[in-house]
Amino acid sequence: MMQHASPAPALTMMATQNVPPPPYQDSPQMTATAQPPSKAQAVHISAPSAAASTPVPSAPIDPQAQLEADKRAVYRHPLFPLLTLLFEKCEQATQGSECITSASFDVDIENFVHQQEQEHKPFFSDDPELDNLMVKAIQVLRIHLLELEKVNELCKDFCNRYITCLKTKMHSDNLLRNDLGGPYSPNQPSINLHSQDLLQNSPNSMSGVSNNPQGIVVPASALQQGNIAMTTVNSQVVSGGALYQPVTMVTSQGQVVTQAIPQGAIQIQNTQVNLDLTSLLDNEDKKSKNKRGVLPKHATNIMRSWLFQHLMHPYPTEDEKRQIAAQTNLTLLQVNNWFINARRRILQPMLDASNPDPAPKAKKIKSQHRPTQRFWPNSIAAGVLQQQGGAPGTNPDGSINLDNLQSLSSDSATMAMQQAMMAAHDDSLDGTEEEDEDEMEEEEEEELEEEVDELQTTNVSDLGLEHSDSLE
């Protein structure tokens, strides 16, 4: 040990004087360190001149030993327990569904500081580099814990909103579009698509079907024969793992189909059975509404009762039309068109039936003696006859013959009657055609028909006019 402390005065003397230092190979320390073979020492031994000009480095340390020494230094550091606690919290937040909050780590820091102060332990070591390393590691894990907390909050928010959306849009009651406790509620074991009267008419057959544990599927030929009502639905898993919905059918005559499942039978998939049944029900309920020009019976009964109660003035006001539309579940246009057609086809035949028959005949006979210049002035008729080569139809006194005048007006009368016929046909569809004429135009058409009847000398029935006497 005395020889190990001697190089310091030797280096000082070497710096002040030019005296060469003693040879190192003769010292026992050099011989002891030269025993393990190393590359650096071989260079110094082979070149004594180089060793004399440069200082000899210290002996190298094994990397594994250096690593173990660094580990021991980290383990002995005062901040290592805090670093370990933070690392465990990050592991728990990563593995489990419940994330450790950053507030809990703040509490742990306060507890650690109080404990260190009570035990009078330092927070740092004598190595500043190691202290800086420990502080940086704690900061990195702290940031990592904050990021894990944010990710966990986002995941929880997404899951909650997704579950709420599924409950809202994919609930069975919303799919069936019916209230809870209705005939199509999923709580009931059977789905009833026919009226209660049909089920009451065949109680024996229905009781036998409801107790059948296995459902029956009706072949395609049975569906093409007529109306079919589904009475019970039982889930069944067939080969391949697919879930189907076997259905027991009841025809419109009340007969229960009890055939076995044949080849090519219709199978209703479980995921689509609710929507298919609902669409079938909606189509059957709205079948009559889709027919053009046919109003519901209860609506026509309400409007007909109002019409008979106001025979003296069968013209409802706008407020009354709105009230009737609300009662009948119709539009204002449908209500207005119905009353227009009802005044023509219901009230007018009643008035005609109440009047005696000789009155129209007398009116027609009287109309033949009207002066002809109302429709065809003498000047116009005489000019037309002269252009045709004379006036063969004129009387000796210069007046116009009535037969010739009526023959001239036959074409125009026919056209007028055809127009009136087309207008009446357009109004035959109740509640579907738009209202293209008001009450004043109605009265003008009636006057036009009366004038045409007055001009016609032939029977009106020869024109083949057909009028509908019923109002749907």
UniProtKB/Swiss-Prot annotation:
Give residue spans, biased composition: Acidic residues. 429-454
Where are stretches of biased composition, namely Polar residues?
26-38
SUPFAM superfamilies the UniProt entry points to: Homeodomain-like
A Gene Ontology cellular component where this protein is annotated is: microtubule cytoskeleton
Residue ranges annotated as compositionally biased, kind Low complexity, are 46-56
The biological process GO terms on file are: regulation of transcription by RNA polymerase II
What terms describe the molecular function in GO for this protein?
Answer: actin filament binding; actin monomer binding; RNA polymerase II transcription regulatory region sequence-specific DNA binding; sequence-specific double-stranded DNA binding
Task: Name all MEIS N-terminal domain ranges.
Answer: 96-179
PROSITE patterns found in the cross-reference section = HOMEOBOX_2 (PS50071)
Quote the Pfam families the UniProt record gives.
Answer: Homeobox_KN, Meis_PKNOX_N
The UniProt annotation puts the region (Disordered) at 1-62, 351-371, 386-405, 422-472
Q: Which InterPro entries match?
A: HD, Homeodomain-like_sf, KN_HD, PKNOX/Meis_N, TALE_homeobox
Where is composition skewed (Basic residues) in this entry? Answer: 361-371
Q: What is its main location?
A: nucleus
The Swiss-Prot or TrEMBL record marks DNA binding at: 291-350
* Domain of life (superkingdom): Eukaryota
Q: Which UniProt keywords apply?
A: DNA-binding, Homeobox, Nucleus
Q: Where in the cell is it found?
A: Nucleus
What family does this belong to?
Belongs to the TALE/MEIS homeobox family.
Q: Could you tell me what this protein is called?
A: Homeobox protein PKNOX2
